[in-house]
Amino acid sequence: GTYKSEVFHSTEGLKEFVRYIDHSKEKLIDDVIHIVTEKQGIPVEVAMTYNTSYNESVYSYVNDIHTIEGGTHLAGFRRGLTRTLKKYADDSKLLEKAKVEITGDDFREGLTAVISIKVAEPQFEGQTKTKLGNNEVTGAVDQAVGEALGYYLEEHPKEAKAIVEKVILAASARVAARKAREQVQRKSPLTGGGLPGKLADCSSKDASICELFLVEGDSAGGTAKQGRDRTFQ
């Protein structure tokens, strides 16, 4: 028989991959930050950018194998990203107007990134063996991302400010959502609506001690309603 072959080539590699992932999203910054280096004998390549969405899209690879469950290279990337962005924001006094505590998740809202590393003897973990377990990788990726991203932020203050402002917005929205949930949970579920059917409310409004207590209603033998403690049942 005859063999059929096709050659696939991407001129810009991971940068083009990131643009492809983000093609339908509104850009926060125009640049795709591209990192190509080697740390501790481990080749590291990262392409990343930010969009205006609320989602994080990060894809990680080792020796061109898609590590669906992430692993130590993803942990190193996240650590380097958070540490570097926070340091830049602190040094630039951009977080002074933030009245909320910033978490790692806030730094990754709207982030799109592709991480690709090469490891001589990869150790895979997890049920599907798609999680990298090599501990030495974490520090290498952390260092690579920290150095290159730090340099980019210093050289591009406009883009850096846009990223930090989005981080602050993400943190503020997260805190506001949590407060709204807590307020709803504190309210009595029966407030304003009256009780359905023959249920009788208890006097306590503390949901943590209240319970639904079911007894036999009116029958030939009378009612067992008095058997409840009206304080919390």
Question: Model segments located where?
Answer:
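GHKL-family ATPase ATP-binding module
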Residues: 1-233
